[in-house]
């Protein structure tokens, strides 16, 4: 591997850490209903953990309600159990044709908890970015040790890796701040 491909690989892996953070954030409940809220919930469907979206239609008729319409009658109770078991604090209402989830307004305490979770996810993303930096720097040092890279080039490449890291850590902070603001807005 040469210096360029190490830097490109590091950038790609840092992008993936940010994408994972965005997925985690999409599952965090704000005050509004969103289909992505139930995306992470798996239903034990015939012994296989299956995403709700693969066993039912998920719709958001208004900002305070999610409706789930299972394609299989047997899935009603399974979906209901899966939603209750999730840590989202949602209460499904099953009327036999459709499952409704009314999204109650968040309490101040719940908002603070969600803010903490958002910060935790952001911190995990930063750790992932820093781990990528460490791996890239180790690969660069191996190149230098094998005389494939001069000391000056090593220093320059490490500076580039640090700039990448700083950029992605700043991006993480920016996304975390936006998510916290969204959670705290009533």
From Swiss-Prot:
Record flagged with keyword Protein biosynthesis: yes
Any one GO molecular function term: ribosomal large subunit binding
Record InterPro entries: Ribosome_recyc_fac, Ribosome_recyc_fac_dom, RRF_sf
- Cellular localisation: Cytoplasm
Q: What is its main location?
A: cytoplasm
Instruction: Give the GO terms filed under biological process for this record.
Output: cytoplasmic translational termination
**Keyword list, A-Z:** Cytoplasm, Protein biosynthesis
Q: Name one GO cellular component term.
A: cytosol
Q: Which SUPFAM superfamilies does UniProt cross-reference here?
A: Ribosome recycling factor, RRF (SSF55194)
Which superkingdom heads the taxonomic lineage of this protein's source? Answer: Bacteria
UniProt keyword DNA-binding present: no
Q: What does this protein do?
A: Responsible for the release of ribosomes from messenger RNA at the termination of protein biosynthesis. May increase the efficiency of translation by recycling ribosomes from one round of translation to another.
Q: Which NCBIfam families match?
A: frr
The family this protein is said to belong to: Belongs to the RRF family.
Please state what the protein is called: Ribosome-recycling factor
State the species of origin: Nitratidesulfovibrio vulgaris (strain DP4) (Desulfovibrio vulgaris)
């Amino acid at each position: 591997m040469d210096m360029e491909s190490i830097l490109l690989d590091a950038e790609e892996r840092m992008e993936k850490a940010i994408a994972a953070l965005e997925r985690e954030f999409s599952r965090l409940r704000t005050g509004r209903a969103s289909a992505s809220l139930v995306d992470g919930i798996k239903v034990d469907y015939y012994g296989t953990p299956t995403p709700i979206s693969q066993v039912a239609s998920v719709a958001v008729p208004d900002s305070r309600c999610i409706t789930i319409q299972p394609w299989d009658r047997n899935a009603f109770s399974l979906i209901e159990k899966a939603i209750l078991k999730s840590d989202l604090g949602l209460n499904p209402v099953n009327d036999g044709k459709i499952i409704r989830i009314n999204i109650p307004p968040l309490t101040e305490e719940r908002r603070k908890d969600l803010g903490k979770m958002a910060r935790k996810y952001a911190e995990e993303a930063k750790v992932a970015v820093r781990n990528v930096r460490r791996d890239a720097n180790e690969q660069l040092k191996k190149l230098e040790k094998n005389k494939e890279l001069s000391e000056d080039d090593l220093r320059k490449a490490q500076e580039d890796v640090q700039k990448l890291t700083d950029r992605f850590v700043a991006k993480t902070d920016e996304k975390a701040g936006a998510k916290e603001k969204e959670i705290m807005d009533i």
